């Protein structure tokens, strides 16, 4: 499995994604926007078909990507997830913009209390990939009840070109309406147009996507709300993304 931060979909040309327990942190090249202070490294979660947790193997960090193996010892569907929860702050220091990401516990220590133009957001981000050995199963797909999540109606490893797939989006375990969904097919560097598909969840949190062709797709959902916000944050930003493979019929 490859994990990277890139500008073009499914190409490794920027920096590796840093994950706890994958490779040595000292091997990872420096990266991130100017003025961004150190951010927490997320943990990789691998859920087996029976719902148990599995450890990654042979992890390494390269110049442009992190890599690891997953032993598919069970038949069924595995869920690979990277989730991050915390705070994001921005302010000015000596006239220069500063940004910070971290935990609520470290906020008071790392961020000046009277920082100029201080803005604080409560953030939760989740990225997922689904892998199936043999017939698809559903036990590993159960939501955690935290942040913005995908609850499949159509199995994520049972997607076909020309067919509609249905998903339900949850916020803290409950269906959420009006979530903006963006779906982009891979190979965008070879197209003049992005080919983006836009959709929005209905009142029951449901959305339907029809895949125009076979291939790899990036699906992203974002939501900004003032519900469930804890101080010092004034808003909540939640995002979800998944890499999906669509097969020819």
Task: Locate the predicted segments by residue.
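Glycine-centered loop-to-beta-strand initiation motif
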Residues: 62-66, 195-215
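A cross-kingdom marker for long, charged
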Residues: 206-249
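Short amphipathic, basic-aromatic surface patches that mediate peripheral association
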Residues: 5-34, 171
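Short, aromatic- and glycine-rich surface loops/edge beta-strands on solvent-exposed regions
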Residues: 76-87, 216-223
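Short acidic/polar inter-strand loop motif in beta-rich domains
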Residues: 8-10, 84-94, 225-231
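Short amphipathic beta-strand segments in non-cytosolic proteins
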Residues: 42-48, 180-198
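Beta-strand-rich domain onsets/edges
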Residues: 101-165, 170-176, 190-191, 234-249
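A surface-exposed beta-strand-loop module
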Residues: 59-75
